[in-house]
């Protein structure tokens, strides 16, 4: 939840979830 993964998740899920990122406020964050 602290480090932006440089990915948006407005229309599609976070592809970066493979490395531990999750969607928050339309942006993918790690931790």
Curated annotation (Swiss-Prot):
The keyword Nucleotidyltransferase does not apply. There is a cross-link at residues 1-31 (Cyclopeptide (Gly-Asn)). It comes from the Eukaryota. Keywords: Disulfide bond, Knottin, Plant defense. The keyword Cell inner membrane does not apply. This is a cyclic peptide. Disulfide bonds join 5-21, 9-23, 14-28. GO terms for biological process: defense response. PROSITE patterns: CYCLOTIDE (PS51052), CYCLOTIDE_BRACELET (PS60008). InterPro entries: Cyclotide (IPR005535), Cyclotide_bracelet_CS (IPR012323), Cyclotide_sf (IPR036146). It holds the Pfam family Cyclotide. Belongs to the cyclotide family. Bracelet subfamily. Probably participates in a plant defense mechanism. Has cytotoxic activity, active against a human lymphoma cell line with an IC(50) of 0.96 uM. The presence of a 'disulfide through disulfide knot' structurally defines this protein as a knottin. This is Cyclotide vibi-G. The lineage of its organism: Eukaryota, Viridiplantae, Streptophyta, Embryophyta, Tracheophyta.
């Amino acid at each position: 939840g602290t480090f932006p993964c440089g990915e948006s998740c407005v229309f599609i899920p976070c592809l970066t979830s493979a490395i531990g990122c999750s969607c928050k406020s339309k942006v993918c964050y790690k931790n």
